[in-house]
Amino acid sequence: MKNASSDLFSVTAYKAIIQNALDNHYVFMTVKEFLDKGSPDKKVFILRHDFDKKPENCDIFINAERELNVRSTTYVRVANNDYNPFSYIVYPKLKKAEKEGFEIGLHSNFVEYSKFTDIPIKEALTSEWKALSAFFNIEGMSCHRDINYSYNSLPWVEENDLFLKKIGIKYQAYDKKILDSVLYVNEGLNPHLCWRNMTPQEAIKTGKSICLLTHNHWWYYDHPFEN
């Protein structure tokens, strides 16, 4: 028998979430646009994607969003073992999206990278930011953590706001200005893939602004093992 929850993370289910929000008069914004508008706490929907792995699937959300004429923010890793953001496969897809109004940002666990490579923390972050900035027009970042992460970069980010501004980072995605104004909805493992705390549909019913965080490697078109 098919698991009743097995279609929760299909592209069809994702498009249904967006359509539900549109039907309930939500306005879609990138993270940058949300901050530029003063972080409104009602009827705004942010689609945030942390691109962790599975490069062949990097635009699975973007393709769905194009169909429904909404825009999102994708945070991209530079220093990692899973993909090259400047590859022949990944870069054209993300650059095309940026030209269409999608936002690209940096996704990084630079503290962990520093610990494992002996590159100073500030140098690691600056180098990642400069590398991605050379290919995309970026303004923000989000901190990355693997399931088995050893070091968390977020505390360092929160304590070094002036340094972030100095190298050109205008915002970080876990800023209180964002989190205090939205219902934060995301998928995760508990122990299997599920929605944490609440589902997108439950959040939409409240009328409050929503930040929906998703990860491309957990989503699929037809079934979870298609790639």
Predicted regions and their residues:
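Terminal accessory/targeting
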Residues: 1-48, 52-101, 111-227
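Beta-strand-loop-alpha-helix segment that lines the small-molecule cofactor/substrate pocket
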Residues: 103, 107
